[in-house]
UniProtKB/Swiss-Prot annotation:
Gene (UniProt): menD
Co-factor binding comment: Binds 1 thiamine pyrophosphate per subunit.
Lineage, highest ranks first: Bacteria, Pseudomonadati, Thermodesulfobacteriota, Desulfobulbia, Desulfobulbales
Protein name stated in the entry: 2-succinyl-5-enolpyruvyl-6-hydroxy-3-cyclohexene-1-carboxylate synthase
E.C. number: 2.2.1.9
Top-rank lineage group of the source organism: Bacteria
Amino acid sequence: MRAKQHISDLAHHCIAHGMRHLVISPGSRNAPLIRAFAASSQIECLSIVDERSAAFVALGLATELQAPVGVLCTSGTALLNYGPAIAEAYYLRAPLIVLSADRPARLVGQQDSQTICQDNLFANIVKGSYSLPEEPETVAELELSARVIAQAFSTALSPCFGPVHINIPLDEPLYGGELMAESLIALSPLQLAEPKGMSPALWQEVESAWRGAKRRMIVCGQGVADAELQALLARFAPDKTVTIIAENTANIVGPWLVDRPDAVLLACDEASRSLLAPDCLISFGGHLVAKHIKLLLREFKPAFHFRLDPAQMGIDTYQCLSAELDLAPTTFFRRLAQQVEPAAGFRDLWALPEGVAENQDDEFLVLKRLLGQLPAGSIAHLGNSMSVRHAQKLASRADLLYHSNRGVAGIDGCLSTAVGVALATDQLVLCCLGDLSFVYDSNALWNRNLPSNLRIVILNNQGGDIFRRLKGPSVSPGYQDFFVAHHPVQIGKMIEAYGVAYRRCLASEIDGFSEEFLGLQDGPLVLEVFVDPTKRD
């Protein structure tokens, strides 16, 4: 048996289980892992030095590809830098495979260099934590290693996607030795968990509640485009007792749904709000951006609320959960849509009133222009926190896809995630974010693989503009310094230091820049738009 045979096996087995992309940050302890993966022609390896950015790039790849993507680092604090992206992957449900090199157990806690306790480091934000055997010497130990890898991938991929952490203790020597062209150990098959379905009694309860309700609502949370799900939900169009809520991040579109629920609720008088609440609610998917629809459903609780979630995590966003159904949405609606009959009613109340004044924020008008001009098939990656909110005020385009890091909704990796998305597709990817978000994640541009289909628009409002809009911070001591946090960074010079093409304009000049900005380029392009933070609704 060759030295580090289990590392060669790890690379072969990760590839066999569907990993085709790996983002590597350099180090010494992970040298055997780097050698094993870099030697394979079946996986694309990207080198990104900053581990925090690297993990978000991997997250973007996994989100767009809907497939397992790996991220690999050395031991010590390098691994801690993966934390924000792992948390986002956990709540966004992305199949991120975290591979960390480690010291042997005998050296942990013994003042050895670059050593922390890495086992179960992310226990609360991964679906599973695993550790490979230290330097296995027997076939039985290698077979155990193969089973651990298969179990990790099974957990990451079923019943819903999510991140897993595989820790790999490595002893010296770390360099040299022969790499095996194939594994000596048979591949352990994946044991993918399937949704368990529903008992006949529970089906009867759900169908009875649905048929008996006069005001029925389906809330579609954040998700990826799914043609079958889209077609199934379209079957409810003739039945206006059914209102379907789907923001652009749900990637479900149609004239029969409500894509701007908060706009409707904000235009509604207080006395009429209760009429917009359903008797029976079906929900699925990830987070909503809209705040007021959540407040409505918590205040005027439906008699029945059924959430579709094979992960069975007990999520009760609206504080009125009747039952969590262990079914995929397509399976559920395939059956429920058989009962659709034309009817009038509830949905008409959710029509956006005519004559509602359009938002006149500089930021909103810039986003409206750019999102309106994006070529069909493009992807809009919406940064936290104002960019994604402004985008919810626009009608969803059926020919675009929408991404956003709404799992945890932090600003720390928006740009790096967009880079990963752009690396996974040939379509144009527009990343919209604010100046603080850009500066925070500017190391996303410290990347030799930046794709030419990436466009970045920075809405520079001189700080964290969301805090100017909230009543609390604006009357707090230190408001400008500690909430808005205006910064002195000259963003243009920063971008030029990374060697990326850069343009700048005022919000009022966007019409003269948008065509060039969204057109074909030889590389990525950044447009910094200076907006007036006082010009807002």
